Amino acid sequence: MSEKFVKYPHHLKYESQDLKHVKLGFTTREGGYSLYPESSFNMARYVDDNPENITKHQEMLADAIGFVRAQWVFPIQTHENRVMEISQSHRGTNIDTLTDDMYGIDGIYTYEPDTLLTMCYADCVPVYFYSEKHHYVGLAHAGWRGTYGQIVSEMLKQIDFDYNDLKIVIGPSTSTTYEINDDIKAKFETLPINVKDYIETRGENRHGIDLKRANALLLNHYGVPFDNIYITDYATSEDLSLFFSYRVEKGQTGRMLAFIGQK
């Protein structure tokens, strides 16, 4: 399958023939005003960066994708599996300054137009949900904790239409070089999918995990057809000229922004 994330200045845009009203994408580290290193495009206010830089980057992205900043929504992620429906009243939350509003939310969805769902990433898996037919978009943040917590299942529980009408995009995130230990592997063995399909033992207390595939397997287990799931080849830990990587850069790095909305 050919790569559907197409590179533009400062972001990757997902392009598919079935998209008419939905826009989704993922920012890169290229260009911008942040120092991760110099001239990078950090999108997170919670890292050591000048807040004015993030505002400039937001404005640049807003101009590129056609959603003004006042239409954006940004929850405070905590690597859990809480999901929240977004209404028009939530627009603008945590865009200019971070607050306690929407704290501990790692999955969001809406049926509202002109509302941009956003979250920050630097290795964790962005899982995009959309249905043009039902005017629905959603976004989940799935690191190993969110994947183990089955946040994709929590997202699906909120959907009251046929999963055949649902499309999933699994975006840029860490590659299979990401490793977990025996204790974490044991947690994944309790999930309703076969660990042999996404975990590879590489040595004593070392197991490579494919978090993208794990989320795809979970989605399929709960009823989403594999034909409706797209997985990008882009890997944050493999291209530090294009992406930030929390693990590779040992936490001293910026964040990319995943976004999805409908007009």
Curated annotation (Swiss-Prot):
- Has UniProt tagged this entry with the keyword Transcription? no
InterPro entries documented for this protein: Cu_polyphenol_OxRdtase, Cu_polyphenol_OxRdtase_sf, Cytotoxic_necrot_fac-like_cat
Q: Give the Enzyme Commission number.
A: 2.4.2.1, 3.5.4.4, 2.4.2.28
Subunit architecture: Homodimer.
**Cofactor dependency:** Cu(2+); Zn(2+)
Q: What would you give as a GO molecular function for this chain, any one?
A: adenosine deaminase activity
State the protein's purpose: Purine nucleoside enzyme that catalyzes the phosphorolysis of adenosine and inosine nucleosides, yielding D-ribose 1-phosphate and the respective free bases, adenine and hypoxanthine. Also catalyzes the phosphorolysis of S-methyl-5'-thioadenosine into adenine and S-methyl-5-thio-alpha-D-ribose 1-phosphate. Also has adenosine deaminase activity.
Q: Which family does it belong to?
A: Belongs to the purine nucleoside phosphorylase YfiH/LACC1 family.
User: Which Gene3D superfamilies does this UniProt record tie to the protein?
Assistant: CNF1/YfiH-like putative cysteine hydrolases (3.60.140.10)
Q: Where is Zn(2+) annotated to bind? A: 79, 124, 141
Instruction: Report the protein name in the record.
Output: Purine nucleoside phosphorylase SH1728
